[in-house]
Amino acid sequence: MKKILSRALVVCLALSSLPLASCNANSSVGKRQENVLRVASWDEYIDEGGEDSYIPTSDALYKEFEVWYKEQTGKSITVEYITLQDNETMYNKIKMGDEYDLLCPSEYMIMKLAAEGLLQKYPESFFDTSIETNYYAKNVSPYIKEVFENGKLKDGSSWSEYAAGYMWGSTGFVFNPEKIPPEVMKSWNALTNPLCERKITAKDNVRDSYFMGLGMYYEEELLTLKEQYKNGLVSRETYKSELKAKMNDTSPETMNGVKKKLEEMRGNLYGLETDEGKLDVIMGRLDASFQWSGDAVYIIDEAEAYSEEDENPLLLEYSIPESASNLWFDGWVMMNGANVDAATAFINFLSIPINVIRNMYYIGYTSCIGGDEVFSYIEETYGSDDESEILTEYNLSYFFGDNHILITTEEQTRRQLFAQYPDEGTIDRLVVMEYFDKETNTRVNRMWNNIK
């Protein structure tokens, strides 16, 4: 992982001002072709092979899939792997008539595409664990499986009917515990705390910003609710339902309260950022930043590597607010008219344990796939038997299944391991943010544009 992160930092420095482009020169065609699987995803979101791969002699995974598919089916397939800039770019291309077999959007865009009737459901055979090559159904984490089966679309369908999980994570704060007390970073109001004045950044996008605003606006109510749940006064179902309702509240009254919180936040920030803020934290110029968990791992890794020759290396930590935070995921979905056989085979190929490990190593994010082989990789990455350090048990059974307990250093429960796999108590307070309908989207964008 260190190799790819160092490479990514160089790319970030050199190309941060350039737009992302497709890795396939023919992507502008936009139409399906016979024996071609059109896959749309994000830049550097799959193992591209070569020296930065977990297996340096390997080819890109989507190229290796072509060989595997021929071996499995006797049929030839060419993967046209297209990278897009963001979810909105993906949506606009679809609305303009571009056709894809597989897409890898984020959770809210999956909901939007499904609601607009642009996606087709997975066949029942995809979930049949008796089929040898159904690696996704056999290996998906029990936690992710539950999230997808319990998540509902407007028509009552489960997310699992339309989406197969790829990567997942949380949102929280990366921070320097030597400069800002960890207790401060357990609250959404760190964004307005004088101790963080001009030392913290937030995301320059409306969805993350509105979620942060909701966190500040409802923090006291959510902490009270959490205490009631902890003391057995409310059920888990009630707790999760209330969390979801509060952290997806877009009523005019709530939006006005959120606006005031975000205005207060804006005056306390160093600035709003997309990717450039990562480097400021890595270099020690900023003390805290709101980040997605995968980027948090990258920042923590790079800050330590950059300062490793210093007398006091920069050891950043990751904190998820105590009241609530965001559970995000990217998932594979099929457009109407997709090549179902090739599309589902592609997902299953990526769900083979060694390919899961390759993707996690290359990307730095956390796969939706569990299983013993992936746990062994996490154990290899974060486990420790060094008796000179403070060791602790870290229970990952919620994700990998019963009796998957990692022996790790105490500091990892606040650093990369915690960012990739929060403990089960933290998982309970994570909630998915749903998509905005057209009217809500107009209101929230108007509010955000007036603030930033």
Spell out what each predicted region is:
Residues 29-112, 116:
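Early extracytoplasmic/lumenal segment of secretory-pathway proteins
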Residues 84, 104-105, 202, 272, ...:
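Short beta-strand and adjacent tight-turn residues that come in two discontinuous sequence segments
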Residues 402-452:
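Conserved C-terminal helix/tail region of periplasmic/extracytoplasmic solute-binding proteins
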